[in-house]
Each structure stands twice: as structure tokens, then as C-alpha cells.
Amino acid sequence: MTGPERGSNRTRPPYVVVSADAHAAPDDLDQFLDYVDPAHREAVAAFGDLSSVAIPMFGGVDPGRSDDPDAVRAVAARRLAGMGVDTEAARDWLARYSTEWVFASDADGKRLAALEDQGIHAEVTFPGPVLSGGLSPAMYLGGHTTTGLEVVWPALNAYNRWLADFCAAAPGRRAGVLPLDLHDMDRAVEEIAWARGAGIFGGIMLPAMSVRGGLPGYADEYYEPLWSACEEYGMVVNLHTGASGTATDARQLYDEKHGGFLGLYEVFVFTRRPLWFMILGGVFDRHPRLKVAVTENGVQWLPSLVRDMESFFDTHGGAPVRSYLRQRPGDYVAEHVVLGGSLMKRYEAEMREEVGVDRLMWGADYPHLEGAAPVHRLVLRHVFGGLPEEDLRRILGLNAVELFGFDLAQLEEVATRVGPTVSDLATGVELDDIPETFSWSLARPVPLVSSAASAT
């Protein structure tokens, strides 16, 4: 057991760690269909392999759609091979990764135990495909499809009800995030009210504006009922890279050779895009209690965005905006925007004062391949080791606790049992001291300038 440590004249309890970025889904198609209204079950099941709605960066394949774990691992192994990783070794690693360390759902309690083993006490749970065979049409149907609208709400409704059960299996430890379709605003508002009553408290996942036609930008008054419902029920508006942002013309512009890199590069911009529509559209003036979390999008971009918006606000055509906004763009960011820093790098942690210690949240991206399992505790030491204790308390847990409404006392009990302690993060570890696992290799920091470029 990990008890509280004694410091100079005071007790120093372990850190509370909330992963602001996690993903969960039903284990297979049959489990998912059990949650679909029988009147729509056949239509949802017949929607096919979802290849028409898969993000192009996956080459038209949704690795989370298959109910065959071997097929899922084969897709992931091919992706690793494209990054120069030995395919056979990748298959061996993925077989172990998806049976020992990561779990799509938690039918047998293994997921909760795996997270505690990694020093994680609670999670903000987004939908998404996961490597252990999980199925999550909700990730795509909420905003990525241009066809099959008749199955969108039955599929989303099914996922959301599964999510309520998933969260209820670990009370107070999982803040589920609600995917929505915004073409039917009345139904979206009803779903928010239902979700809050069902114990889903992680907020909503906002689709990017660009992925489906027929809807205005997020500055438009069309979304007023949505913002009002989020305020009323205390639901955070979440923008998650990949799950809530990609390009409408991706299929036309991306090809097999270039699509993977282009998709990964551009998806970050499309995920942030709703934020400046909301700021410049006066959404936060009309809804002062609204909070937006941008997750798995890095953290270094936010100070630059604020500087750019402030500059334009004062100069290039900013007069019309100044005439109706009550505050400056930077003020809205300071009051309403937080960042889910999935697998932050050390240099990002060292930017914490520039970005804002009170708006940074650590995310482990469990159970995705680019997450830190099973070396999460070492990664924490590398990223945060030796930094001020009070800053780490906020970034690792307190900011997420306050934003989403976790019970701090409950999580402190878990932290006392499993750590990490203050001593654990008092000193860091070098990058080379972290085992070179296939999963961690995808998230390891790289030089900002390549060796080839620096040699020229």
C-alpha cells in the first residue's frame, strides 16, 4: 500500500491522476447490437463495414469496426510497418498489448485494474476504435458520415446507453463523453438531459463543422439550444482530435501513398477550428459558464493562437468584432478553454506557465496504440519528474477533477492505495531509460530538427 509521505512539517499525499483522454467501446458487434433499438437493429447491422465513414488516415479501414481481434491487430501491424517497424515483431507485440495491458470495455474488471497498475485513478472516456477488438460506430456516425443518416441516431443512442452502463460499473471513476448528431437539435438536447440523469458527466463530443453538409458554423445561433443545455447540465464541450475533426474533401485529396501523413497532420487544425468560431461568434458572452476542452491536440499551439487572435483583434479588420465582443480573445481562452494534453512531451510540460497551469490536463490515451501502456509510470517521471509539486497536482488530476466534477476524496483514496507518490515524481528519468515498446515508440519525443536537416 502507498501511504501518505511526510514532508517538512506536513503530510504529502500521493498525486491524484485523472487521464483526460481515454477511449472505450463495446467488445464486438453483438454486444453493440444488444443496445440498439430492435426496430432499427437490422438497419444498423446492415450499414456494412463502415468503410465509407472511416477516417482516411486509416486507408479506408476502421480498425475498431472488426469483431475479429486478429484482423484488428493485422491492420495495426500494417500501420506500424509503414512507419518502419518490423511487421512480425509488431504482430507479436500487439497480441500481448491487446490481451495483457489494454481492454476495450470492462466486462471482467480487467480495465480498471490495468489503469490502477499504471497509476491512473479515473478517466475521461471518449468513444473510439480500440485495439482489443472494440467497436465504436459512434466515433464516426456522430460527425464523419455523409450517408446512412437513418442509422445515425439509433447507433449513437445505442453507444450512449452502453456508455452509461460502462461508467456505472466504476462509479465516479469514468466521465463518459457523449457523441451527438446535431442535425436534429431537439433530439440532441434531449440526449444531453438523459445522459446527465444516467450518470454520464464527461460532456459532449462536438463534431467538426466541416465533416457533414447542411449545418452552419458554430458561431451561428442555430447552436444556442446546444450551448444552453451544456450550461444547464454542466456538460463540457469536447473537441477531440480524430474523433471530432477531419476534412470534408479528404477522400478526394488523400491517396494511399500520402493519406496517412496528410490526415495526421491536418486533423489537428480541423479539431481546433470550432474554437475560434465560438470565440469570435460571441458564444462565451451568451454562455458564460460554458467550458471547452481540446484533447489530444498538443498544447504548444494555444499561446500562438492567442497571440494571433489578439493581433488581428487590434489591427486587421478587428473593428467589427470589437464592436460586439465584451472581452478580448485571450480573455475568453483564459476563462473557458482547457487542454487535454495527451502524452505531453517534456518540452510541453516546461511550457506550462506560458500555456497556463490551471488549464492543462494530462492524458494517457488509454487504450490506444500510441498511448503509454505499459510504461505509463516511467513516462510520467520523464515528462514531469522534478517539476513543482503544486503544478503537478493540478496538471495530473485537480484540473480535471474540477472541470468534470469528479469526487476528489474518492480518488484520493485510490491514490493512497496505488500511487504515484510525490517521491516517485521527485526526479526524472531519461528517455533512453524507458523501454522501447512499440506503443510508446509512437509517442516518443523526436528532435524538432531532423539529423539529416541539421547536417545540411
What are these regions (language model features)?
Residues V151-V152, C167-A175, L180, D186, ...:
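Catalytic pocket-lining loop regions of alpha/beta-barrel enzymes
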Residues L29-F32, L135-A138, D249-Q252, S304-D308, ...:
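Short aromatic-enriched loop/helix-cap "lid" or pocket-rim segments at secondary-structure transitions
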Residues T146-F166:
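Active-site-proximal gating segment of KS-fold condensing enzymes and close homologs
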Residues M139-T147, Y254-L264, H376-R381:
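Short glycine/proline- and charge-enriched loop/turn segments
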Residues V17, D92-E100, A113-Y140, R173-L180, ...:
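Divalent metal-dependent hydrolysis catalytic cores, especially in the metallo-beta-lactamase
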Residues F126-S132, T241-A247, Y366-H368:
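Short glycine-enriched loops at secondary-structure junctions
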Residues T2-V16, D30-D86, A90-D117, H121-A122, ...:
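Mid-to-C-terminal alpha-helical segments outside catalytic/metal-binding sites
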Residues A22-H23, D365-Y366:
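Active-site metal-binding loops of divalent metal-dependent hydrolases
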